Amino acid sequence: MASSVMQNPRREVSSPSRKTSSKPSLDLRRQTHALLSIRPPFAEAIFRGEKRFEFRRAIFRKEVETVVVYITSPISMVVGEFDVKSVISDDVVSLWERTRSKAGIDSDGFFKYFAGREVGYAIAIGGVRRYVKPLELEAHYGVRPPQSFLYL
């Protein structure tokens, strides 16, 4: 299967930056934000700059520029966001070869996650911003935690 990279044509993202922000950059007039549920160790690795790809079995249909990060239990809070540099779609073996150096997961975990799938997706992470104060998802956004993602 041929691989593809979906570039974000609206914004060029330079080197990753780690900033702290008191409020999210959410602009509801533009449907360019998605909320992702991410397990605590993977979310922490993203904010430390160790994990540069977020893997998904299903991907957005709309263009997404910013991912709002909801850390799952036991934290259960929105803690920050990151810019989407691109989305890579490829067969699972090729996807691992292309992303493994900054995957933030070992090969066993990667292939277990994609078991039974031919194609996988990797969201290339650009600049990251951790909020000064985590936000309660339902109180702040009026939604419940998504199984995978939802558009904001």
How does the language model describe each region?
Residues 2-152:
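Structured alpha/beta reader/binder surfaces that contact nucleic acids or chromatin modification marks
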